[in-house]
A protein has these predicted regions:
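Extended, domain-scale alpha-helical bundle/helix-rich regions
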Residues: 1-58
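Short, well-ordered beta-strand elements within core beta-sheets of diverse protein domains
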Residues: 65-70, 127, 171-175, 214-220
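Short, small-residue-rich loop/turn micro-motifs
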Residues: 106-110, 212, 233
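A short beta-sheet element
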Residues: 105, 127-188, 202, 207-209
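Sequence-specific dsDNA recognition surfaces
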Residues: 53, 59-65, 80-93, 107-139, ...
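Non-catalytic DNA-recognition/assembly elements of restriction-modification systems
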Residues: 4-13, 17-20, 59-89, 219, ...
Length: 243
């Protein structure tokens, strides 16, 4: 839709907000500065890094990383330039109780949830909940440990409307200017799936480091387009499910 705010303005707003929070001591910019990806005059994609003082690194051509062309109103962005990443800490099996506060353990992203957490399967005590990392409504979790390099790094977003505690081997993606449902779908797509596989290590037990997850290249549409994409995918899923 030509009336949509371009993703370049959305990303610019994210960078401005993060620099403000960094200046106030409420957040830290990514190590080495924030990634900015743009199309050069030669039509190729370049990346630079801008630190808190506005100093820019040398340009690096990343055209070989771009998997396909996107509409003019879209942008490519590194995962850590559109959201803050927070690692979880252990909620053990023995910490799970029948009644308590909602929590998520990494194995449940493989066995219980598809692309969203609609109803929480596990609960823990108030004591464990209070010291655990938290996932806000609409935020995303990805797995850092798995059994193969295809499923590793798969994502779900929190659709419960509640704050959830989350355990170790999980990475929370926290961003207010990108839809969590779109981001989870993008990460689970083949576009990011191939990046997840290449970034993984190990055979019997497969791992994905938060440092490598930060570098995932994400196609970012305007916010309204993100909503339309999610709605259309959900329509197709409903049709397939009801067949």
């Amino acid at each position: 839709d030509p009336a949509d705010e371009p993703a370049s303005e959305l990303l610019g707003r994210i960078r401005e907000q993060r620099r403000k929070l960094d200046a106030e001591g409420k957040a830290k910019l990514p190590k080495g500065g924030e990634s900015v990806i743009f199309c050069g005059s030669d039509g190729r994609r370049y990346e630079k890094w801008v630190d808190a003082k506005g100093r820019e690194s040398e340009l690096v051509c990343i055209e070989d990383e771009i998997p396909f062309e996107i509409p003019d109103s879209w942008e490519w962005a590194r995962l850590d330039s559109i959201c803050d990443l927070v690692r979880g800490s252990g909620i053990k099996r023995s910490d799970i109780v029948d009644e308590g506060l909602p929590c998520v353990r990494y194995g449940e992203l493989y066995t219980t949830y598809e692309t969203s957490i609609d109803t929480v399967a596990s609960h823990t005590s108030e004591a464990v909940f209070d010291v655990s990392k938290k996932l806000g409504a609409g935020e995303v979790l990805i797995t850092l440990t798995g059994e193969n390099n295809i499923d590793i790094g798969r994502a779900v977003f929190n659709a419960t409307g509640e704050t959830l505690a989350f355990g170790g081997d999980l990475l929370a993606l926290k961003g207010k200017n990108v839809r969590g449902d779109y981001l989870a779908m993008a990460i689970n797509s083949s576009v990011v799936g191939s990046q997840r596989t290449r970034a993984s290590t190990g055979n019997i037990i497969v791992h994905l480091s938060a440092t490598k997850a930060c570098r995932f290249l994400i196609p970012v549409p305007p916010l309204d387009e993100q909503r339309r994409i999610v709605e259309r995918i959900n329509e197709f899923v409903t049709l397939i499910t009801n067949q």
